[in-house]
Amino acid sequence: MKNSLTDYRLYHGAWVYCGRPDTEQRLTKKQAKALLAEGGLFVRNIYDFDCQEETSFWMIVKDHFDDIPQLKTSIRTTIRKSLKTYDFKRIPSLPEFVELAYPVYREAMLNYKVKAIPDSKEKFMADCASRTNGEYWVGVERQTGEPAVIAVNQVYEDMCEEVVLKTRPKFMHNSTYPTNGLLYEMYRYYLQERGVNMLCIGARSLTEHSNIQHYVIH
């Protein structure tokens, strides 16, 4: 099976694959050049999803749910604190999600060490709407009702891929761990309640450069 160039989308300067992460194939130089001729800075091409040997770049996949008692003590503490502080919920309406999520997305983008220009609200909504079977999550601080963390997931028949995860900067260093709580709730929902076989939750390389939470790895 070969990729079609229509399977790629331009996202913040990078061409990224839109299909299931386990179906992406290696692009030829000609295909990569054809994409770059349409704009963008680089092509992200992740192939050999389940190769036999260890490489310097790998996807993080979770295939079972660990309830709180099964986790390390330090992780249990962060999740319990998060669940006491925030309400985590799946939002069925895209317009409602965008109203809650866009301020979180914008502030998170502006807070990156390598400055990134946030998309407009309209473009953010269009990007969310373009996701195949997209599902939307928000974590809201109970005391104030303020959105603290958001996620957009792309759901397939037997797997779920996390494609967006953003946390409002002011909630990242107040010891309430909104991201850990949201991840825990999503893992419970998809792996235990929905019964998907696996969640694909990002990539990591030997350079340790990743936005994946410590909780996910450990």
Report residues per predicted region.
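Acidic-and-aromatic substrate-binding clefts and catalytic sites of carbohydrate-active enzymes
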Residues: 23-26, 96, 203-209
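Conserved active-site alpha-helix within GNAT-family acetyltransferase domains
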Residues: 52-56, 206-218
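A conserved beta-strand-loop-helix scaffold within acyl/acetyltransferase catalytic domains
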Residues: 1-10, 45-52, 61-175, 189-191
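A conserved short alpha-helix in the GNAT/GCN5 acetyltransferase fold that borders
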Residues: 32-36, 183-192
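N-terminal accessory interaction module
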Residues: 1-48
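Conserved GNAT acetyl-CoA-binding A-motif
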Residues: 39-47, 191-204
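Conserved acetyl-CoA pyrophosphate-binding loop and the N-cap/start of the following alpha-helix
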Residues: 173-185
